[in-house]
Amino acid sequence: MKKNTNKILPMIGLWLLAVFSCLAGAAPPAASQFTQWTDSRSAALLSRAPAQGRLLKTDIVPLRHLLLTAREAVVISVPLPDGSLADFRLTPSRVTAPGLLEKYPGIRTFSGYQLDNPENRGRFDISPRGFYGMFRYGAETVYIDRRAEDDNLYVSYSYKNRPMPSRALMPRLSPKKEPQELSEQLARVSSENQVQQAQTRMRTYRLAISATGEYTQYHGGTKELALAALVTLVNRLNVVYQRDLAINLELVAGNDAIIYTDAATDPFANDSFDGGLNT
């Protein structure tokens, strides 16, 4: 009996060691794998940053490599407008059809949440355009955007301090409801939707978005860069749609076929008819 016990105990020890090794290998990293954010003090650049925004320098190369090669969750530090960093666990989460993802491997999207407070969550993407994020942090919605003049220059700002386009470029229509009434209605609908979401299965809607030649040129002139801009747009829409409506938007596999690079040959006239198609 003693001899059998001596054989069994080492076997149990080996089995436990194997189990703990597997669990350790499956566990997400606890420490941030990217922390390279430093505040920029350039007066010229700060003057063009959003009010109360935070201008930062980074090295996008290691961050891009980390995210493009990630097959499982990674942890990175993201800059907050108040001057601090928060560690977020990012998990690959696509907003494009698999075929489109395979065709443009330099574009990846992620869902993520803060390690210290999982209620703070949002979505992030990496592409040739850089790193972009939109996430909830406490009572604020925070954005991280790349500045156009430098691949390694970024700004972190809250929604209330977002940069606003010139009013001259924004034709305005008379509101059908008073702002206070509309705000109360939206808050009520959002609250009701969040209560129902736990009982609702997430639905995916396939989406096709065309881009004019002007849009593509504005974002760098290539289909990949225009698609990357559309991916950032859809990724951010999904922050709201998934939370409030249990809806996931996904760009179709052939979406790049309707991204045009030349304003002179695209099928859009940029007249009121085109505007009607977008309303």
Regions found by a protein language model. Give the residues of each.
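Bacterial N-terminal signal peptides that target proteins for export
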Residues: K2-G13
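Intrinsic-disorder/low-complexity regions
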Residues: K3-T5, I144, K160
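Bacterial N-terminal signal peptides
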Residues: M11-C22
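N-terminal prosegments of processed precursors
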Residues: G25-N152, F273-T279
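Fold-level signature of zinc-dependent metallopeptidase catalytic domains
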Residues: P28-L56, L153-T279
